[in-house]
Regions:
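N-linked glycosylation sequons
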Residues: 1-175
Length: 175
């Protein structure tokens, strides 16, 4: 590590919910290490591309992280790159940690390529969530005797097995 600040990039879209606690725990550990080294910390929720990235004392950063929660939509990480680039240009030497949910929303390689360019020679550590792949249910069609939904998978390979439990407005099971 360096003596420069720590920048924590945090995936916080819908796909991060399954492994949210693990990501917050990892952020806590990173912040504790920065605190021991008396380093400032910048928290960058990747769902907020227009948010100004600012350096804070470790204690403040810890509170900021605990106030975050997963957003109920997909996050376009790419849109955050300009703000990250501005911050890195202004702050110079720093360590960067990306607490990834491991989900590619379609522009993952574009984000990684862009991040690689702006990070330059600064240390970058990517933490994968280690959680089971996320799924989303979309296009629900409710018919008289059945309900059909489409399942979106976070990663394209293989076949998944699982159970979907559907409830009506009165909390009674459907199907």
């Amino acid at each position: 590590g360096s003596n420069g600040p720590l920048v924590i990039l945090l995936d916080d879209g819908w796909s991060s919910a399954a492994s949210w606690e693990a990501r917050i725990k990892a952020a806590d550990e990173l912040i504790a290490n920065a605190e021991n080294d008396r380093r400032g910390v910048a928290i960058v929720p990747l769902s907020e591309p227009t948010r100004d990235i600012t350096l804070a004392p470790a204690g403040t950063a810890r509170v900021m992280v605990r106030q975050l929660s997963p957003k109920p939509y997909a996050v376009e990480r790419v849109e955050t790159l300009p703000a990250i680039a501005r911050f890195l240009k202004a702050s110079g030497d720093c360590d960067i940690a990306w607490l990834s949910d491991g989900i590619d929303t379609g522009r993952g390689s574009e984000f990684i390529e862009g991040l690689g360019k702006i990070v330059e020679n600064r240390p970058l550590t990517i933490f994968d969530s280690g959680a089971a792949p996320a799924h989303a249910l979309v296009a629900a069609e409710n018919a008289a005797a059945k309900m059909t939904v489409k399942v979106l998978r976070a990663n394209g390979g293989g076949i998944d097995a699982g159970v979907i439990r559907a409830l009506d407005q009165k909390n009674s099971p459907i199907g």
